[in-house]
C-alpha cells in the first residue's frame, strides 16, 4: 500500500468525461475496457500475469479477470483506508506513479480504473491475495459495499473487475465484439506469451476467442500481411539504450509486400500511438538513411535517382514498439509520443541492425531497393498527371470538372458534395438539390480499384482525376486538407450489389489516398429509402427490410389477438416481441436454405457448426419462453401466424420497392435522401487502422483465395450476396 501515491481527486471526471477518455461515444465507451485491461497487461509486463479473461456479460456489463498479484488490500499509510479503495476512487492513484512497482506501464495518464469507476453505474471488484478472496462494490466512484473477505483462495492470486458503464453519460450503450477483439488481439501480439481469452455472452451468437502468440510482433506482421504477397522475409530487430529516465527498449518487425500502400503501427508501453511520434520519426529517418547508404555503397542507387522516404516505404508493413519508463504523450488520449530522446535511440538501433541485415541478405536488400526505384519512377510519372488536378485556388471554380454541378456557397463548412452513381440519378439529384450548399458529381461506370493500381496509373484514370479536382485538396506531395472545397463528401449509390461495389471502390480510394478526409469526418454514406409505403393519402419512406417488417408487424397487431401455446392472450408488448422473433427465425431459416442447408436438420444437430446453426439455436431457445419449440415452427403453424399478422398489416397499404436512385423524381430524392432536416446519413470512421488495412487488402487486393474464404465464412451474415 505504501507504493500507492495520491496525486489529486477525481470529481472532474463525471463533469468532463471527454477530457479523460477522449469522448462519450463508442470510442470512449470501449476505452473503459482498455483501461482495466491495461492494468492486467502492466502485471504481465512486470512478469506477474500470464492469463487475462475478458467477458461481455448477458446484462451488458463487462468483466476483466487476471492471475496477477491482485490489487493491494492492506491499509494505505496516509489515506487510512484500504489501498484498493484508494486505487479505485482517487484519480492518479496507482503503483505505476512511483516507479518501483512497474518499470513501464500503459493506462491513460494513470487515471486508469478510478476513471472507469467514476463513469460506471456500478463496479464490483474481487481480489485474490494473501490466501483470501476480498470483495468491494462501488457506484459512480463511491463505495457502496466496503471491502470484505468472502472466501479462501489458497495460493491463487488475481483481480476480477466487473463494471456497467453509466448510460446517462455515454451515447453508446453496448460493447462491440469486433472493436474489442481487434484491441485484445493487438495486446496479445505485443506481449508474447500472454494468453487473452475473450467471450461474448450477450450477443445472439456466443463468440469466443483465445489470443496467444509466442511469435509476438513477427506474428503480428504476418497477420497484417496475410492478404498480401510478401517481397521480403519478416525482418525483426530489437535493442535497448539508456534514456533520460531509464532504459528505453525498442522492438521492430517489418516486411515489404507487393502492395502500393504503407502500414505503420506504433506503440509505446502497449498504447497504440495512432499519430506516431518520436519512435516513428526515428524509424523513418533510419530506414531512409540506411537504404540510401546501402544503395549508394553497392551501386544500386545512382546520383540521378531522387528518392524520398515515401518511395522507400511503399509496400512496407512495420510495427515499432517501444518501452519508455516515463512516456510523454501529446494530447490527453495518448495518440502521439513526445519523448525527444526516443527518436535518436530508435534511429540508432534500426540503423545498426538494418544495415547488418542488408549486408547479410544482399538479395533481399536489392529487391527492396528495386521496389523503391519503381515507386520513385511512378511518382515522377504521376507528377505530370497531377498537374491537371492541381487547384488554382480554393473555391474559385477554375478548372473544375465539366460535369460537376457546383454550389454557390463559398464556406466549405457549409457545403456538401454528392458523388452520385449514374447520370439519371445525377440528373434527379441536380434538379432536386439545394443549389446554395449542395454540389453534384455524377460518376459514370466503375471507379478504378486503387488497391491494385500504382499512383501513375491511378492519375491517368478520368474518374479519379475528376474526383481529386472536385474535392480540391490536391494529391500526394501537394495534399492540403485545408483546401477541401466541401466538408461533407456524400457517397450516394443504389441499394443493390452494383451500388455496394461502387461504394466500396470509393471508400478504398478515400482510405488509401485521402485518409485525412475520413479522419476529419468529412466522408458520409447516404441512406436512400428502399421502400415507399402509401396508406390512404399518407406516404412514408422505409430505409430497410427490417424497418418494413417492424412497421407491418406493428400495423398487423392492431386489433389482432395473438395467443401463446397455452392459449393465453399475449399483451401488445409480448405479441410484438414474439412476432419480431418469428420474423428473425424466418429470415435466418431462409438464409440457411439459400446456402443449401435444411434448417430443420441443422437445429437438431448438436455438432452443426457455423453462424447459421448457432443463430437458429439461439432464436429457438428464445422461442421456448412462449412455450413453443423448433417443431412448432417447421410444422407450419408459426409461419402461418406471422403471415396472417403481416397480411393484416398490409391491408390498405401500397408498398413500392425502389430499384435505384433514378426511379425517384427530383423532389422525392431530395426529401428522402438529401434534405438535412429529414435524411439519414452514416459518417465513415476508422477506429483501427490495422483492421481497416486488412479488410481493404482482403476485399480489394490481388489475392483471390483469402477473399473466397472470407465470403464462404461470412455468407450467412449478408442478405444480398452476388456470386
Where are these regions (language model features)?
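Conserved phosphate-chemistry cores used by DNA topoisomerases
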Residues: 1-723
Amino acid at each position: 500500500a505504501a507504493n500507492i501515491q495520491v496525486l489529486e481527486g477525481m470529481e472532474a471526471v463525471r463533469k468532463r468525461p471527454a477530457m479523460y477518455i477522449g469522448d462519450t461515444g463508442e470510442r470512449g465507451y470501449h476505452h473503459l475496457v482498455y483501461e482495466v485491461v491495461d492494468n492486467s497487461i502492466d502485471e504481465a509486463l512486470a512478469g506477474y500475469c500470464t492469463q487475462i479473461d475478458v467477458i461481455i456479460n448477458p446484462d451488458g456489463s463487462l468483466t476483466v479477470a487476471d492471475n496477477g498479484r491482485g490489487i493491494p488490500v492492506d491499509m494505505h499509510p496516509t489515506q487510512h483506508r484500504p489501498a484498493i479503495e484508494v486505487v479505485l476512487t482517487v484519480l492518479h492513484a496507482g503503483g505505476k506513479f512511483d516507479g518501483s512497482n512497474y518499470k513501464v506501464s500503459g493506462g491513460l495518464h494513470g487515471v486508469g480504473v478510478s476513471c472507469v469507476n467514476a463513469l460506471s453505474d456500478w463496479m464490483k471488484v474481487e481480489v485474490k491475495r494473501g490466501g483470501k478472496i476480498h470483495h468491494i462494490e462501488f457506484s459512480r466512484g463511491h463505495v457502496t459495499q466496503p471491502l470484505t473477505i468472502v472466501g479462501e483462495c489458497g495460493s491463487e492470486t488475481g483481480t476480477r473487475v466487473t463494471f456497467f458503464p453509466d448510460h446517462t453519460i455515454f451515447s453508446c450503450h453496448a460493447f462491440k465484439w469486433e472493436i474489442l477483439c481487434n484491441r485484445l488481439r493487438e495486446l496479445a501480439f505485443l506481449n508474447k506469451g500472454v494468453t487473452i481469452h475473450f467471450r461474448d455472452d450477450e450477443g445472439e451468437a456466443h463468440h469466443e476467442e483465445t489470443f496467444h502468440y509466442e511469435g509476438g510482433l513477427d506474428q503480428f506482421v504476418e497477420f497484417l500481411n496475410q492478404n498480401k504477397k510478401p517481397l521480403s522475409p519478416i525482418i525483426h530487430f530489437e535493442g535497448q539504450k539508456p534514456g533520460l529516465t531509464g532504459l528505453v527498449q525498442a522492438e521492430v518487425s517489418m516486411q515489404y509486400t507487393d502492395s502500393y500502400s504503407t502500414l505503420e503501427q506504433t506503440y509505446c508501453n502497449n498504447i497504440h500511438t495512432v499519430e506516431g511520434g518520436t519512435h516513428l520519426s526515428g524509424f523513418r529517418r533510419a530506414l531512409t538513411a540506411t537504404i540510401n547508404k546501402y544503395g549508394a555503397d553497392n551501386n544500386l542507387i545512382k546520383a540521378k535517382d531522387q528518392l524520398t522516404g515515401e518511395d522507400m516505404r511503399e509496400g512496407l508493413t512495420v510495427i515499432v514498439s517501444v518501452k519508455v519508463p516515463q512516456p510523454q504523450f501529446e494530447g490527453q488520449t495518448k495518440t502521439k509520443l513526445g519523448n525527444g530522446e526516443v527518436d535518436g535511440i530508435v534511429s540508432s538501433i534500426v540503423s545498426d541492425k538494418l544495415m547488418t541485415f542488408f549486408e547479410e541478405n544482399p538479395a533481399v536488400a536489392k529487391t527492396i531497393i528495386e521496389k523503391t526505384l519503381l515507386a520513385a519512377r511512378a511518382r515522377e510519372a504521376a507528377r505530370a498527371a497531377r498537374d491537371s488536378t492541381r487547384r488554382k485556388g480554393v473555391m474559385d471554380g477554375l478548372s473544375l470538372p465539366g460535369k460537376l454541378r457546383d454550389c454557390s456557397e463559398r464556406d466549405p463548412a457549409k457545403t456538401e458534395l454528392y458523388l452520385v452513381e449514374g447520370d439519371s440519378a445525377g440528373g434527379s439529384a441536380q434538379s432536386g438539390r439545394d443549389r446554395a450548399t449542395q454540389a453534384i458529381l455524377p460518376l459514370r461506370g466503375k471507379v478504378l480499384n486503387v488497391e491494385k493500381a500504382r499512383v501513375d496509373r491511378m492519375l491517368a484514370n478520368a474518374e479519379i482525376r475528376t474526383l481529386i479536382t472536385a474535392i480540391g485538396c490536391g494529391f500526394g506531395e501537394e495534399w492540403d486538407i485545408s483546401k477541401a472545397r466541401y466538408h461533407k463528401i456524400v457517397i450516394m449509390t443504389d441499394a443493390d450489389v452494383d451500388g455496394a461495389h461502387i461504394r466500396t471502390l470509393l471508400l478504398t480510394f478515400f482510405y488509401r489516398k485521402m485518409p485525412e478526409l475520413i479522419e476529419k469526418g468529412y466522408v458520409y454514406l447516404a441512406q436512400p429509402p428502399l421502400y415507399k409505403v402509401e396508406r390512404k393519402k399518407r406516404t412514408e419512406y422505409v430505409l430497410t427490410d427490417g424497418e418494413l417488417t417492424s412497421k407491418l408487424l406493428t400495423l398487423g397487431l392492431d386489433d389482432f389477438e395473438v395467443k401463446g401455446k397455452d392459449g393465453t392472450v399475449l399483451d401488445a408488448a409480448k405479441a410484438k416481441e414474439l412476432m419480431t422473433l418469428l420474423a428473425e427465425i424466418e429470415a435466418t431459416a431462409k438464409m440457411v436454405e439459400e446456402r443449401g442447408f435444411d434448417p430443420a436438420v441443422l437445429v437438431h444437430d448438436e455438432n452443426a457448426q457455423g453462424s447459421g446453426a448457432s443463430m437458429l439455436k439461439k432464436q429457438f431457445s428464445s422461442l421456448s419462453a412462449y412455450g413453443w419449440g423448433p417443431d412448432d415452427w417447421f410444422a407450419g403453424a408459426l409461419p402461418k401466424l406471422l403471415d396472417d399478422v403481416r397480411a393484416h398489416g398490409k391491408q390498405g397499404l401500397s408498398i413500392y420497392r425502389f430499384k435505384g436512385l433514378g426511379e425517384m423524381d427530383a423532389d422525392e430524392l431530395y426529401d428522402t435522401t438529401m434534405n438535412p432536416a429529414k435524411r439519414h446519413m452514416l459518417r465513415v470512421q476508422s477506429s483501427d487502422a490495422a483492421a481497416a488495412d486488412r479488410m481493404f487488402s482482403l476485399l480489394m487486393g490481388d489475392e483471390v483465395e483469402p477473399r473466397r474464404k472470407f465470403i464462404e465464412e461470412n455468407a450467412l451474415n449478408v442478405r444480398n450476396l452476388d456470386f
